[in-house]
Amino acid sequence: DIIMSTNTFSEEAEALLKEALETYLKEFA
């Protein structure tokens, strides 16, 4: 369970980072 939770967290975190990066580029690029 811990491994699955960690994996899910990593995938969600990666998605959030990508979304944040795209938003940053749109705002400041």
UniProtKB/Swiss-Prot annotation:
The UniProt record lists the keyword Membrane: yes
EC code(s) of this entry: 7.1.2.2
- Give the record's keywords alphabetically: ATP synthesis, ATP-binding, CF(1), Chloroplast, Hydrogen ion transport, Ion transport, Membrane, Nucleotide-binding, Plastid, Thylakoid, Translocase, Transport
- Judging by the UniProt lineage, the source's domain of life is Eukaryota
| Recorded GO MF terms | ATP binding
**Topological relation to the membrane, as annotated:** Peripheral membrane protein
Which processes are annotated in GO (biological process)?
Answer: ATP biosynthetic process; proton transmembrane transport
Keyword field contains Metal-binding: no
* Residues annotated as signal peptide: none
**Which GO CC annotations does the UniProt entry carry?**
chloroplast thylakoid membrane; proton-transporting ATP synthase complex
Subcellular compartments: Plastid, Chloroplast thylakoid membrane
This enzyme catalyses: ATP + H2O + 4 H(+)(in) = ADP + phosphate + 5 H(+)(out)
Q: What does this protein do?
A: Produces ATP from ADP in the presence of a proton gradient across the membrane. The alpha chain is a regulatory subunit.
Assembly: F-type ATPases have 2 components, CF(1) - the catalytic core - and CF(0) - the membrane proton channel. CF(1) has five subunits: alpha(3), beta(3), gamma(1), delta(1), epsilon(1). CF(0) has four main subunits: a, b, b' and c.
Family per UniProt?
Answer: Belongs to the ATPase alpha/beta chains family.
Q: What is this protein called?
A: ATP synthase subunit alpha, chloroplastic
